[in-house]
Design a protein with these regions (language model features):
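Hydrophobic beta-strand anchors of alpha/beta hydrolase catalytic cores
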Residues: 58-59, 89, 112
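Typically the conserved alpha-helix immediately C-terminal to a functionally engaged Cys/Sec
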Residues: 68-83
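Short pre-active-site segment immediately N-terminal to redox-active cysteine/selenocysteine motifs
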Residues: 54-57, 62-65, 108
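A short beta-strand-turn-helix
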Residues: 38-57
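Structural microenvironment flanking redox-active thiols in thiol-disulfide oxidoreductases
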Residues: 87, 92-103
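N-terminal targeting signals for export/organelle localization
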Residues: 1-36, 145
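Non-catalytic, surface beta->alpha helical segment in thiol-disulfide oxidoreductase systems
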Residues: 108, 113-145
Length: 145
C-alpha cells in the first residue's frame, strides 16, 4: 500500500533468504528432514495462527521496501533454528495485510510483536542485535513457562 502511495519501486531480485513471498525454509546440519519454517501469516488467518496459539509467538511485521526488515528476517529464521518448537515465528507483510498492523498500532518497521495466550507481552521496534533478541526471547519463554 505505501509502495503504491509513494511510487516506490520494488527492490532488485533478492537472495533466497530475503524472499518473503513464500514460506521461508531453513535446515540445520541434520538435513532436509529437520526443515523448520517461518510461516507467512495474513490478516485472514492472524487470529487462528497467532492469537489462539498456546506457544510464545514472534510476529515479524515487514515490508518489501524496508531494508532493515531483511536483517530482521534472517534473525527470525535463526530464532526458529535455535528455539524450534518452543515458539512460533510468523511474518506479516504490512503492505498486503493492512488490517492487523492497524489493529496492533504498528507504526514503524521492522517491528517484532511477542504474544502469548493471545496477549501482547513485548514489542521491539527497529533493529537490535541477534544476541539482544535471543536474550529477550529467552526471558519471555522463561516467564511464559
Amino acid at each position: 500500500m505505501l509502495r503504491k502511495l509513494f511510487g516506490l519501486t520494488p527492490k532488485p531480485p533478492t537472495l533466497p533468504w530475503e524472499d518473503r513471498s513464500k514460506l521461508s525454509t531453513i535446515t540445520d546440519e541434520a538435513g532436509p528432514s529437520s526443515a523448520l519454517l517461518v510461516r507467512d501469516v495474513e490478516d485472514a488467518d492472524f487470529e487462528e495462527l497467532v492469537v489462539r496459539s498456546d506457544r510464545l509467538v514472534v510476529v515479524d511485521f515487514w515490508a518489501e521496501w524496508c531494508q532493515p526488515c531483511t536483517i530482521m528476517s534472517a534473525y527470525t529464521e535463526w530464532l526458529v533454528r535455535d528455539y524450534g518448537e518452543q515458539l512460533l515465528v510468523v511474518a506479516l507483510d504490512v503492505d498486503e495485510n493492512p488490517v492487523t498492523p492497524a489493529a496492533y498500532d504498528i507504526m514503524g518497521l521492522p517491528t517484532l510483536l511477542f504474544m502469548h495466550g493471545g496477549v501482547e507481552v513485548d514489542r521491539q521496534v527497529g533493529l537490535l542485535t541477534y544476541e539482544e533478541l535471543q536474550a529477550k526471547v529467552t526471558t519471555l519463554l522463561a516467564s511464559a513457562a
